[in-house]
Amino acid sequence: MFSYNKERSLRIWELAALLALSISLCAGAWAEARQSSISSRLIRLHVIAASDETQEQEIKLRVRDAVLEYLAPRLDGATDAEAARELIAANTDGIAKAAESAAEGRTVRVTLGRERYPTRRYDGFALPAGEYESLRVILGEGEG
């Protein structure tokens, strides 16, 4: 009788471990599908400061605001991420000029491509970690 209970107990543990593994795999697949769904519908703006110094971080925020102000009317008619991507690609020179106007003499490089991001929390929502289409505006050496 002791052997029967021991075997049954071991079997229950095996089933519990299998169930936990299955739940983990499903949760991971769901999270990946969710991130993929979100990332296919948006383009992230990543302004990289020249350094971590306070003044450089303030300039970065002014550049961000200038780029968003430049892009807002141009992206107003975009119906999806692909249309937005095309509009951004067609306006990289204008984006660079808008950034330069706020960059206080720092060099500016503008690129559009894919980039990995950590989870980022904003007021009222969060974007999961993953790979996103990204408009990058790099100031100076981009070490900030």
Question: Model features per residue range: what roles?
Answer:
Residues 39, 44-45, 119-122:
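Generic secondary-structure boundary/loop-capping signal
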Residues 81-144:
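Mid-length scaffold segments of soluble, non-membrane domains
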Residues 26-40:
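Aromatic-capped interface at the extracytoplasmic side
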Residues 1-9:
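N-terminal Lys/Arg-rich, disordered targeting/topogenic segments
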